[in-house]
Design a protein with these regions (language model features):
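Mature catalytic domains of secreted/periplasmic carbohydrate-active enzymes
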Residues: 1-115
């Protein structure tokens, strides 16, 4: 986002200092939190961060994407991210009927058992 487009948001952040912003605004605004995607960033250490990852390789539902991350990889990510003080935003994609695909359910249940 250009600095001009980011300015109204920046002004709101100044007017409401309790407002939380992330690093995606652009325009030179760093935000309160880092939000790396599909990677666990070591450069986020020392500030609040939330790692955004998918359970396979696609954001949302994609019937052709069957490249599921293993339960072990997802648990490792969860452990790694939270041990560094971060949040783990794991994207799962229900289909058009609102049904979570069984491979996702299996992995989420494995994570729940681990917790």
């Amino acid at each position: 986002m250009s600095p001009e487009r980011a300015r109204p948001f920046f002004d709101l952040m100044c007017e409401y200092p309790e407002l939380i912003s992330n690093n995606r605004l652009g325009g030179g605004v760093l935000g309160d939190t880092g939000t790396p995607e599909q990677r666990i960033a070591t450069d986020a250490l020392g500030r609040q961060f939330e790692v955004c990852m998918t359970i396979n390789r696609s954001w949302g539902y994609n019937a052709t994407d069957l490249r599921w991350k293993s339960s072990q990889e997802l648990i490792r990510n969860l452990s790694d991210i939270t041990s560094k003080g971060g949040n783990y935003l794991l994207n799962v994609g229900p289909d058009a009927e609102g049904i979570i695909p069984e491979p996702e359910v299996e992995r989420l249940k494995a994570m729940g058992r681990w917790l």
